Regions:
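Ampiphathic alpha-helical segments that act as solvent-exposed interaction surfaces
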Residues: 87-99, 119-151
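Short, surface-exposed recognition loops or helix-turn segments adjacent to catalytic cores
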Residues: 37, 105-107, 145-159
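A short acidic-to-branched-hydrophobic micro-motif
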Residues: 56-78
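Short, internal acidic amphipathic alpha-helical interface segments
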Residues: 72-112
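Acidic, Ser/Thr-rich low-complexity intrinsically disordered segments
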Residues: 154-204
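Charge-rich, low-complexity N-terminal segments
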Residues: 2-53, 178
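Short, aliphatic-rich beta-strand segments
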Residues: 113-118
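Short Lys/Arg-enriched helix C-cap and helix-to-coil transition segments
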Residues: 205-211
């Protein structure tokens, strides 16, 4: 299912294609969030966007009137003690009062903490979408600090990088290509990239050409 919307200029827009182009056409050479290169999967009714530098998965839905960005935190509250949940909800409400555009909500049977923002499809352009993405990421990092979850999300980021390296090895990437990925995409220095790659390949007993 493809959603076509008439934008402010009166032309038809396939938002899946347009947003995917915005997220994948960067160069990873600037600080601008819209210059980051995202891995985007098109699930027809929504997009899934991931970046090795970001410990969150983004889900981007579109309808005839709005584009919705949802950031999944993976933090479920359904099984927590009532006082714990009350404290979390209070902190989320206080965070919502500090931020514009984006809002934290509880979603699903697991009562997961997610962040969402709705954008008017009729007037949306790349700059507004980029501002919304920046707002989402800023709000998420505010939550991490508020809940003191730095270690948890650093581990998630490390796990994501390890998984990406394993996927690239399975696809036949060379050691040089893996090092280039760690240095240019992740932003590591050469020595750190080599140490991490050695650790990954030794742990999972890959072939000698990766070591």
């Amino acid at each position: 299912m493809f959603i076509y919307v008439i934008n402010g200029e009166g032309s038809m827009v396939n938002w899946n294609d347009e947003i995917k182009k915005w997220l994948t056409s960067g160069t990873d050479t600037k600080e601008d969030i819209m210059d980051m290169v995202w891995n985007v999967k098109d699930e027809k009714t929504y997009l899934i966007a991931e970046n090795p530098k970001i410990p969150f998965t983004l889900y981007i839905y579109n309808s005839e009137k709005f584009i919705r960005i949802i950031a999944s935190t993976g933090l479920n509250t359904a099984l927590l003690e009532p006082l714990q949940r009350l404290d979390i909800y209070r902190k989320l409400l206080l965070l919502n009062d500090k931020i514009d555009m984006t809002k934290f909500v509880i979603s699903g049977t697991n009562e997961e903490i997610i962040l969402k923002v709705d954008l008017d499809a009729a007037s949306l352009d790349k700059n507004e979408f980029g501002d919304a993405l920046m707002g989402v990421l800023t709000s998420l990092y505010m939550m991490i600090r508020e809940f003191q979850l730095e270690d948890e999300f650093n581990k998630r980021l490390t796990d994501r990088i390890v998984n990406m390296i394993q996927e690239k090895i399975a696809e036949g990437a060379t050691r040089e290509e893996l090092l280039e990925f760690l240095v240019k995409k992740i932003g590591l220095d050469q020595k750190t990239a080599e140490n991490i790659l050695n650790e990954i390949t030794n742990k999972f007993e890959y072939l000698p050409e990766y070591q």
